Each structure stands twice: as C-alpha cells, then as structure tokens.
Amino acid sequence: MLKLIVETKTLMQSLGFARSIIEKRNVIPEYANIKLSAQDGNLELSSTNMDLYLSQKIAVQVLNEGEITVATQTLSDIVRKFPDSELTLTEIEITQLEIKGQNCKFNLFTLPVSSFPAMDSIKPEVSFKISCADFAKIIESTKFSISLDETRYNLNGIYLHIKDKEFFAASTDGYRLSISWITLEEKIKNFGVILPQKSAEEILKIVKDPKNIHEDIEILLSSNKIKFICNENTILLSKLIDGTFPDYSAFIPKSSVSKLVINRKIFADSIERIAIITVEKFRAVKLSLSRKILEISAVGEARGTAKEIITASQDKESFYEYNHDESLVIGFNPQYLEDVLKAIKSDIVELYFSDISASAPVLIKFPRNPKDIFVIMPVKV
C-alpha cells in the first residue's frame, strides 16, 4: 500500500498543473480525481479531462509502492495550507489517503484505481524536438487570436505546421491573423494539425515553468493526437481538432502604399489610455496619421471623448514616422492592437497600409522579430 514522503512545494506545483487540466464542472468523479502512483523513487501524478491527459513525475522518498486516486481539488486545497516543508502520504485500507504533517493530519476518501482511465497510446507519424523557449514564443505570439466562435470549430485552436524546415503556428478569428515561426535544425516531414485552445494554454504553462524553459520539448504527432514530452518527466497528450485550417497566406497583404513606424510602448500605452472611453458594444479607436503627428481618438457613447497626440520624432524612446504625404484616417478595435503590442516585446513596431481608403487589412511587423507577423482588419469610425 502506498506510502511516501514528498516536499510540499514540489507536490503543490504539480497539483497546480493537474488542477488546470481538470474541468471545474466535471460530473464524472473519475475525471475530477488524480491518480498517484509511487514507484522507483518517483511519484507519478496523472490527470485527465477526456480531451487532455497529463502525466507528471516528481522525485519522492517511496516507503511503500502503490497507487490510488483522490479528489484533485481537495488534495490541492489541503496541501496548499500545510506549513510543513515535507508531507507523508499513506494509503489507509484502500479507501482512504492520509496526508500528514508534523501537527496536522487529513484523511481523504479515494476511488478504485481501476476506474481511472489510462493514457491512450499514440503511433507517431512525425516526431521532433525544439527548445521550450522557442515553442513558448510561437504559442504566445498566436494564442490571443484564436476564434471563440464554436460554430467555426476549425478556428478554435492554433494551426501547427511544418513546411521546408520552418515550424509555424497560426491562428485567426476572422478579424485578425497571427503567425509565428522558427527554423528547425533538421528537415522534418511536412504536416499540419490544429491544437485546441485549452491544450495550447496548458502546454504553454508547462514549457514556461522555470524548470523547463531552458530544456527541450519533444513533439510526437499522429492523425488525431499530439503528444508533448517536456524535460522527460512531464507528458501531455491532447486530441486534435478534426478540421481544415484556411490557407491564411491569401489574407496577408503583399504590398503597401504607406507605413507607420512607432515606438511600441508609446503606441501601446496611448491605445490603452484612449480605449478607456470606449464602450463594449462598439469598441473603436481612430488613428489620424500624417507626417507630423499621429492623433489617437475615441468616442464613448454616454461616456465622452478622448484624444492624444504623438508628434514626429527620431528619438528611439519616442520614435514616430509616417512616410506618406497624404494623411490617413483609420479605425481599429483597440483590443486587437493591444494584444499584438503586448505579445512582442520589441522597441519598434511597423504598420503597413495597403491603401488610403482605410478598409484593407493592415500588416503589422516588428523589425527585431522578423518571424512574427500579424494582420488586423480595420473598423469603421
């Protein structure tokens, strides 16, 4: 019967990842539980929500090998409140788990291990390794433009694909498009899959963890599943979205007639300030561009108006340059601009305008990040 000693901090961190996987309104008891398996000096923690399966291994002192399942939320809440640096977990008569510190003890009811689902096997058609830092970069640069419209299920995730040694991530909600990529060290078979939003969020948390960010992640792909192996001790298996992602290359503007170059932070801060006056029903900020100034303004129904002016400058900290003699007035959903400007921490951002009519998609680039591009549709103002 299971008995082990574990560092409280280490257990708490793993339970945090497990809790994130499990659906909060889970009506199936087995899927609200976590399986604990103690063997060979390790504790394996398994959690699932049917679409995702997470397995984590942490080093512990195993006094007796064994495995049990227990309510994830309850176990996590208890462990979080323990002041002790170490805890002893002991299986009691198959139906209970004892969690014991120096002066405090809990007994939790358990469910049979036989009722907990096993991780599905996967027959990979493609497998490769990249750094966790690179993978985090392409997911963070694209996750915010995933469509939330469930009727457009093929847009409810990030399109991961390889083409000619380039590993791409792309997402779109029909109003904006985000693309980020890295170059692989070796040539891999071309492929394309759609990673669900929830899966993207969970693997991003894992690769950004301090113990993983400087390691590699192995990615294994089949026709309907994707498996991530991070730092050898963490495995995330996810179902894929069964659908076809649109050919997004057709939506990327191929030419421009004018360009705005501006300090990213100055621009982002101004957009965020002016957007305060806008209302949820119709969120729009107006950009009035000329060679000398950029005027950012907005009108909020039953709220008022707001306006800010940025003057032309060649100073790095306040850089602003618009390269067309004819002025341009164009509107954007401020949230769409803010998402892009927050995703890439670069000094300078460039906006490319295809025409002066202010109705064509706008291409956004960052000179220091050439492998990230964004497209936003303007709105009427």
UniProtKB/Swiss-Prot annotation:
Record's signal peptide: none
One annotated Gene Ontology cellular component of this protein: DNA polymerase III complex
Localization of this protein: Cytoplasm
GO BP: any one term: DNA strand elongation involved in DNA replication
Cross-referenced InterPro entries: DNA_clamp_sf (IPR046938), DNA_polIII_beta (IPR001001), DNA_polIII_beta_C (IPR022635), DNA_polIII_beta_cen (IPR022637), DNA_polIII_beta_N (IPR022634)
SUPFAM superfamilies per record: DNA clamp
Gene Ontology MF: a single term: 3'-5' exonuclease activity
Gene3D superfamilies attached to this UniProt entry: 3.70.10.10, DNA Polymerase III, subunit A, domain 2 (3.10.150.10)
Superkingdom classification of source: Bacteria
Keywords: Cytoplasm, DNA replication, DNA-binding, DNA-directed DNA polymerase, Nucleotidyltransferase, Transferase
Primary localization: cytoplasm
Family to which the UniProt record says this protein belongs: Belongs to the beta sliding clamp family.
Subunit structure: Forms a ring-shaped head-to-tail homodimer around DNA which binds and tethers DNA polymerases and other proteins to the DNA. The DNA replisome complex has a single clamp-loading complex (3 tau and 1 each of delta, delta', psi and chi subunits) which binds 3 Pol III cores (1 core on the leading strand and 2 on the lagging strand) each with a beta sliding clamp dimer. Additional proteins in the replisome are other copies of gamma, psi and chi, Ssb, DNA helicase and RNA primase.
Role this protein plays: Confers DNA tethering and processivity to DNA polymerases and other proteins. Acts as a clamp, forming a ring around DNA (a reaction catalyzed by the clamp-loading complex) which diffuses in an ATP-independent manner freely and bidirectionally along dsDNA. Initially characterized for its ability to contact the catalytic subunit of DNA polymerase III (Pol III), a complex, multichain enzyme responsible for most of the replicative synthesis in bacteria; Pol III exhibits 3'-5' exonuclease proofreading activity.
Protein name (database record): Beta sliding clamp
Gene name of the record: dnaN
